[in-house]
From Swiss-Prot:
Signal peptide: none annotated. Keywords: Membrane, Transmembrane, Transmembrane helix. The lineage of its organism: Eukaryota, Metazoa, Ecdysozoa, Nematoda, Chromadorea. GO terms for cellular component: membrane. Residues 58-90 are annotated as: Disordered. It is found in: Membrane. This is Uncharacterized protein B0495.9. It is a multi-pass membrane protein. The chain crosses the membrane at residues 101-121, 226-246.
Length: 267
């Protein structure tokens, strides 16, 4: 009986010790969990505070940058307004005088060049038109065959002027020329010829060759064209090119003068 009582007491003590151990272990685990939750809560709060500080700092930087950009825009607007108020800079009178001299020089050069070109165009025509009258360009003429048989082969022709624009040739006769046994009533005779100048030259030389006259001994043949459309177009193109070159050079000269003036103003 006593031994059973001791066994029961020992067993109760063991059970009580086991439960106390379990309770202590559970209490320790609960304390650890509470500590971990506190740490996690503190970390979360720290992250939240850090994010808030970053957002606030970024907002402050954006605001400062915006204010800086607005200040620069205002400064540019003020500078632009100042430039508009100042207006275009006045050009030095000496620069204007130089430009006027240059314009006059270019105009004079263009006039002289045009005059030379016109002189060269009409020099040959003036020599060819020597001995001709205005009526020679309008009065009716004779056929080419009649001219060869009655005038050319009888040696009564001194010089021939071919006018391609009028489809005719003007033959200037010798003084005292005799035609059909009579003295010629006019100093020239008009020959109707609708073909070109090369063909006219070939026909005249062939007729002279038939009577034994060589190429070097034949009648002088001149070409009279006058102021044709082609010559007029060439003249206009030449004058336009000269004027364009003068304008471009004038712009370059004006730019150089203004740059030099600006450099002198800075110094």
């Amino acid at each position: 009986m006593r031994s059973q009582l001791l066994f029961s007491t020992h067993r109760l003590a063991r059970c009580f010790g086991h439960r106390c151990s379990i309770f202590a272990t559970t209490s320790h685990e609960n304390a650890l969990i509470s500590t971990q939750k506190s740490i996690i809560s503190m970390q979360t709060r720290a992250i939240h505070l850090t994010s808030f500080k970053f957002i606030r700092a970024r907002h402050t930087d954006d605001k400062q940058e915006k204010n800086q950009n607005e200040g620069e825009d205002n400064q540019k607007g003020e500078n632009k307004t100042t430039d508009q108020q100042d207006g275009p800079k006045k050009i030095d009178p000496s620069v204007i005088r130089k430009l006027r001299i240059y314009v006059l020089a270019v105009a004079g050069l263009s006039f002289v060049t045009s005059f030379i070109m016109l002189s060269q165009m009409f020099t040959g025509d003036r020599n060819s038109a020597d001995g001709l009258t205005n009526e020679d360009f309008t009065r009716p003429g004779i056929p080419m065959k009649t001219f060869i048989d009655k005038y050319l082969k009888h040696g009564e022709v001194q010089r021939i002027v071919f006018v391609p624009n009028n489809s005719r040739a003007i033959a200037i006769l010798h003084r005292g020329a005799v035609i059909d046994g009579k003295a010629a009533s006019e100093a020239s005779v008009i020959v109707e010829y609708p073909q070109n100048a090369q063909q006219f030259w070939a026909d005249v030389r062939r007729a002279e060759g038939e009577i034994g006259i060589g190429l070097t001994e034949g009648v002088q043949i001149d070409l009279y064209q006058g102021m044709t459309t082609v010559k007029m177009i060439q003249l206009i193109i030449g004058v336009v090119i000269l004027a364009w070159l003068g304008t471009q050079y004038g712009r370059l000269l004006r730019k150089r003068l203004l740059e030099n003036q600006a450099k002198k103003g800075k110094n």
